[in-house]
Amino acid sequence: MQPNIQWLDTPAVFRVGQLPAHSDHRYYATLAEMAQQQSSFEQSLNGTWQFHYSVNAASRPKSFYELAFDAQDFEPITVPQHIELAGYEQLHYINTMYPWEGHYYRRPAFSTSDDKQHLGMFSEADYNPVGSYLHHFDLTPALRNQRVIIRFEGVEQAMYVWLNGQFIGYAEDSFTPSEFDLTPYLKETDNCLAVEVHKRSSAAFIEDQDFFRFFGIFRDVKLLAKPRTHLEDLWVIPEYDVVQQTGQVKLRLQFSGDENRVHLRIRDQHQIILTADLTSGAQVNDLYKMPELVQAWSNQTPNLYTLELEVVDQAGETIEISQQPFGFRKIEIKDKVMLLNGKRLVINGVNRHEWHPETGRTITAEDEAWDIACMQRNHINAVRTSHYPDRLSFYNGCDQAGIYMMAETNLESHGSWQKMGAVEPSWNVPGSYDEWEAATLDRARTNFETFKNHVSILFWSLGNESYAGSVLEKMNAYYKQQDPTRLVHYEGVFRAPEYKATISDVESRMYATPAEIKAYLDNAPQKPFILCEYMHDMGNSLGGMQSYIDLLSQYDMYQGGFIWDFIDQALLVTDPVTGQRELRYGGDFDDRPSDYEFSGDGLVFATRDEKPAMQEVRYYYGEHK
């Protein structure tokens, strides 16, 4: 297939040549590698690449992927990094409106009577910046003579990929991994990878989150070798009997390549407690009963077990060994109250954007570790990944720390239904448009398939502030069908109550007052109540928190919420007059339209210094640990 620039304009094309989403488990060549958490099957492509910036698609170097192309005009750029923070593009923060409002008239594809009005909307726009990346690499010895895929863990917003002059594929969905098979065109040395990233595409209508509007390759890029027998996908489904405190594990495994033996081991924190042997068929579905009482997982006791699957050949040599931590816990609704392991669940939560004051949404494992430690010392027991999937490593950290997760799908179309504060959903997407269904469901599928093994995830969230419609009904049904062990969350049906019966297991609101919450709970409530956003911490805020905390003792069906939000979105810049480093917020970069200091709602400053408001959080959340 040949690439088409008009893929940018239509929601019908969102993945081309992309491999199916799968579990995020890691795998190793030896037991020693697994012990060190260093896999020889992985090769990082992070580092210095070559780069060219174009203001639109028409002016981009169209043949830059060809091996004979002269890239002398390209400049060095660090990957991962936002293109804006490399100095090529204006910084821009906005909350609700689409970033082009006031500059261009645009409506989502298929939302008007003109079913062709979207053609050229982004592909022919006079302003839709393009980043053209080139990177030359040699394969490490361990990756040679094997199947090799490339994983982009985060690219905003639409990308085309070539290797050695051959088109590989196309991907949207900025915040989940995109993988492509490079094997047919790969060489041992002097490979030329070309990636073309477009700032906006039809996906911009459903990635309208409250944040700085960056683009580029902003998360890790790596190569992954697949040995001759490979575990493609792994789903550990622990089942926990709360009364008996016993457990069993369902395993759904998908292998590729040669059929070989597999040694299965389950470890607790001290020793191996279960072993079994199986064969690496294409599909494996097995059930294993734990031999003794199990230790449940919760915020207070984040007990983890570890599954190991070692593939061995006929000579007994290890081909591959995979590892997946998991835990036993049960989340359910009984008598309209959410229970975790048989006890009422109280959410002392916070919404969290990924952020660093110098690198934006390009963050590190150290940043994540600081955030989790900060939550723990301030009695924050839950996090909502607002409003997109986070880096893979953050989910592991929450598993280990006992932080409850609301795992949000990358979906927000705020500007399509709320205009200048008024609810006006006449061209809301995805809404009930068939043409938007596949792209939207693909985002749910990728979110689920990638993170399904993480015990910390109690809720799948359909997204944020996208109103409602039949497409979200189908998202809800997808999550419920795939994973009945978790709850599904969505707030937007509050504004479209005709969908309340078919979307969301919980009554979720934003910024409802204590009086409004009481009114719901005093009038035949049908679902447990949570606040997916509350206590908007902008400026010197967070007063009145006790009014919400008191409700926890008054109503069993009121089960807490997620403060907005954890960290300011602000950037450290050098003032040209004083030479001092200072934090700048939305609107400080001559970015228009903008919502200005609305980017600064965190309990901690962008520099990760706690604000005084955090004292309130520590005190009140500490009452209901």
Curated annotation (Swiss-Prot):
It is an enzyme of class 3 (hydrolase). It catalyses: Hydrolysis of terminal non-reducing beta-D-galactose residues in beta-D-galactosides. Its EC number is 3.2.1.23. It comes from the Bacteria. InterPro entries: Bact_Beta-galactosidase (IPR050347), Beta-gal/glucu_dom_sf (IPR036156), Galactose-bd-like_sf (IPR008979), Glyco_hydro_2 (IPR006101), Glyco_hydro_2_AS (IPR023232), Glyco_hydro_2_cat (IPR006103), Glyco_hydro_2_CS (IPR023230), Glyco_hydro_2_Ig-like (IPR006102). SUPFAM superfamilies: (Trans)glycosidases, beta-Galactosidase/glucuronidase domain, Galactose-binding domain-like. The active site is at E465 (proton donor), E533 (nucleophile). Coiled coil: none annotated. Pfam families: Glyco_hydro_2, Glyco_hydro_2_C, Glyco_hydro_2_N. Heterodimer of a large (LacL) and a small subunit (LacM). PANTHER family: BETA-GALACTOSIDASE. Component of a beta-galactosidase. This is Beta-galactosidase large subunit. It comes from Latilactobacillus sakei. The lineage of its organism: Bacteria, Bacillati, Bacillota, Bacilli, Lactobacillales. The gene is lacL.
